[in-house]
Amino acid sequence: MNIIDQVKQTLIEEINHSIQKAALAEASDIPDIKIEIPKDDANGDYSTNIAMVLTKIAKRNPREIAQAIVDHLDTTAANVEKVQIAGPGFINFYLDNAYLTEVISEAIDKDEKFGSTAEQNGKNILLEYVSANPTGDLHIGHARNAAVGDTLANILTAAGYHVTREYYVNDAGNQITNLARSIEARYFEALGDDSFEMPEGGYHGKDIINIGKDLAEKQPELKDLSEDERIKTFRKLGVDYEMEKLRTDLSDFNTHFDNWFSETSLYEKGEITEVLNKMSELGYTYEQDGATWLRTTDFKDDKDRVLIKNDGNYTYFLPDIAYHFDKIKRGNDTLINLFGADHHGYINRLKASLETFGVESDRLEIQIMQMVRLMQDGQEVKMSKRTGNAITLREIMDEVGVDAARYFLTMRSPDTHFDFDMELAKQESQDNPVYYAQYAHARICSILKQAAERGITPSKDADYTLITNDKAIDLLKKVAEFETTIQSAAANRAPHRITNYIQDLASHFHKFYNAEKVLTDDVEKTKALIALIDAVRITLRNALSLVGVNAPETM
């Protein structure tokens, strides 16, 4: 339990004792005491509405109850400096800030671990994100999925979960056959044979042309294979080429995976047949119009879904069911999928399919990622000036840098539409959120370097009582919120809460910096302030690391 949680828990316990001492209610009758942070700092550090909740039990008006609680409160034990009754009976608590100084020592002690939960909570989460088809380049939608997914994985890990990061490689569907036939056409074209036409819905990108040329140069003997063998070969080679490029782009985007799960493996291991037989044995499938259907309406879906079409081919849904059942079999407590906006209709059917196996549907969480518009000079940018095609992740990285791209793409809740201002992302000004945050870190490093030249280094032995400036106290309170913010971001699957926190912390630091000089002739006070800003540095660095963004020491 972090310091903030300890303080809140102590306050709740002391309020509970006060209620009993005031004879307002028996211990067994006292409802849960809720502690909130007031929106306005003027209303204290914490507030509770317990006096209003107790009116029926205590049979008194809420302000009388509030006064009785205040009169019997052990303020010393509760770390409270001042108490105020407001409105109809809210109780506002102004804490004794002495407890905050422990945060400095904790940050310096834990360093890179500061903010993270010390112990695992025993929960296994499989987080699937990106999972783009290996048929072309990654684009802005994939970039948002990658940034949000990787950041969420970092946050969940810091919050004590065991997280497996997984990319589902769609290497077995019709789109891969189309990829193979597209490569085949370009392969023979490179050999001077134009008789092979591009398939309907084929891939016309420059990357396919390059793959065809490369194979024609290195493996001209492929032309002598039978058509079936040639298409089988082009399927594998095409996926290998595309996946190598995707892996490189994602790695350069500071996005990493524990597993690259092949759809083909589901067929090879017989898992699709296994789940189909299992669902049939349980009575959840039926035949109609020559097709095999799953009774997903039994589990709140709006209609039943086809598993096998009347031509004998599987729908995409069947291997997806097998894949998610495989995830459960691997011992995962919770499955989290980050899907594009076009997958919204997939949620109910996928949850319903798991329920056919007796798996509770709430074990599968699906986060729909909304669209991103790339903006430049106030105008939407849809096509690359260089290639004439949709702008790729690689081009975005080259244009604004990895740090800015990742930070901007995690600044908003994933379920909201977002305009990515590329000009702003490149600015070296306070208007650029990532520059603003990184500059705060670099500024702290500069001050620490100057202090070291004077022989002053961050120390837990500094006299923290010398930290009295209101801006310094506000800054320290913000540092103390870090672990709680991580826990909140993890529980709500909300990576943007970390970028919001980073902005707040950087803002508090800049206000403090403008209000109080750190390096002065008062050596003891300087030591205390150096320890404070080192705690801020550690917090900023760790928070930026969660988002996959660097914390530069100079700028």
UniProtKB/Swiss-Prot annotation:
Claim: Repeat is one of the keywords in the record: no
Q: List where the protein spans the membrane.
A: none
Record localization: Cytoplasm
- Cite the Pfam families for this sequence: Arg_tRNA_synt_N (PF03485), DALR_1 (PF05746), tRNA-synt_1d (PF00750)
Q: Which GO terms describe its molecular function?
A: arginine-tRNA ligase activity; ATP binding
Q: Which CDD domains match?
A: Anticodon_Ia_Arg, ArgRS_core
Query: What family, per the record?
Result: Belongs to the class-I aminoacyl-tRNA synthetase family.
Q: In its UniProt entry, what is this protein called? A: Arginine--tRNA ligase
The organism named in the record is Staphylococcus saprophyticus subsp. saprophyticus (strain ATCC 15305 / DSM 20229 / NCIMB 8711 / NCTC 7292 / S-41)
Classification from the root reads: Bacteria, Bacillati, Bacillota, Bacilli, Bacillales
What gene does the UniProt entry assign to this protein? argS
